């Protein structure tokens, strides 16, 4: 379902953010709205949170989709066209993980993570067709530092995030000659609901690995995304790390 919350001026650029209801996604929605964009907040299970984001942003709307289901991805793109009439920026932020060491990991757990990665690829493919009709667009993929460093108990997740950065590089080359820019932002450990639940000893070990000595804020990631979605006219195929110096690429 999609719902228009209000109307913006004619010709407003439209940004669609998957996983836009909480954490980094929420901050990205707010940052893009601050740049004058109309934002589509895409969620799967956090309807109340998605509506709270949209309610605070001019012209924002919400849409629900399980990206692991190709039929729902197709329905989402149709909804976006009906509600907004255009998409100028796609931020692939939705992420999913099931932590377990390899011998405890079930095939269903792996498939759930891989299914979301496939859905991100499929959504990107469908939105790209709209971009090509409009002769331009911006894609920003939210990957992760662990896609580069690895992390215990997160093999499917690290594979998915590393693959997302590989997709960024390959797709940027495929879009040669078109005004379609594709980049990744790879956050480190960011203060979100996910990291808030870490045990104190784990949090301490993480902070010891970060030269800046603290976790990042969602807004710090969102500002980089907003730059790539707006002013970055000569950046494509890049992975930009936002991790406090934990990893340099």
Please place each PLM-identified region on the residue numbering:
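Alpha-helical segment proximal to the catalytic Tyr-Lys
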Residues: 129, 173-177
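Residue(s) in the substrate-gating loop at a strand-loop-helix junction
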Residues: 144
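Active-site loop-to-helix junction immediately N-terminal to the catalytic Tyr of the SDR YXXXK motif
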Residues: 105, 150-158, 170
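Short, small/polar-rich loop/turn modules that mediate ligand/substrate recognition or access, typified
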Residues: 176, 181, 236-237
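C-terminal substrate-recognition "lid" of short-chain dehydrogenase/reductases
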Residues: 136, 214-242, 247
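Active-site helix of classical SDR
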Residues: 116, 124, 160, 168
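Conserved glycine-rich cofactor-binding loop
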Residues: 21-22
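Substrate-binding pocket helix/loop in short-chain dehydrogenase/reductase
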Residues: 101-102, 108-111, 206
């Amino acid at each position: 379902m999609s719902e228009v919350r209000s109307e913006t001026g004619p010709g407003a650029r439209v940004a669609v953010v998957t996983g836009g209801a909480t954490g980094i996604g929420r901050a990205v929605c707010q940052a893009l709205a601050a740049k004058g964009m109309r934002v589509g907040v895409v969620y799967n299970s956090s309807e109340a949170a998605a509506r709270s984001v949209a309610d605070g942003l001019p012209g924002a709307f919400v849409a629900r989709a399980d990206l692991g289901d190709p039929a729902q991805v197709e329905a989402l793109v149709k909804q976006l066209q009906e509600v907004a009439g255009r998409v100028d920026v796609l931020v692939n932020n939705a992420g999913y993980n099931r932590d377990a060491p390899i011998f405890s990991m079930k095939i269903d757990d792996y498939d759930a993570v891989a299914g979301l990665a496939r859905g991100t690829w499929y959504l990107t493919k469908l939105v790209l067709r709209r971009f090509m009709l409009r002769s331009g667009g911006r894609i920003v993929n939210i990957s992760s530092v662990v896609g580069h460093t690895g992390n215990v108990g997160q093999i499917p997740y690290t594979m998915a995030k590393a693959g997302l950065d590989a997709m960024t590089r390959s797709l940027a080359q495929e879009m040669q000659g078109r005004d379609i820019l594709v980049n990744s932002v790879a956050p480190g450990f960011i203060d979100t609901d996910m990291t808030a639940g870490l045990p104190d000893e784990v949090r301490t070990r993480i902070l010891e690995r970060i030269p800046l000595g603290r976790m990042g804020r969602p807004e710090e990631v969102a500002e980089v995304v907003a730059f790539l979605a707006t002013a970055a006219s000569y950046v494509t195929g890049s992975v930009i790390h936002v991790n406090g110096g934990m990893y340099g690429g």
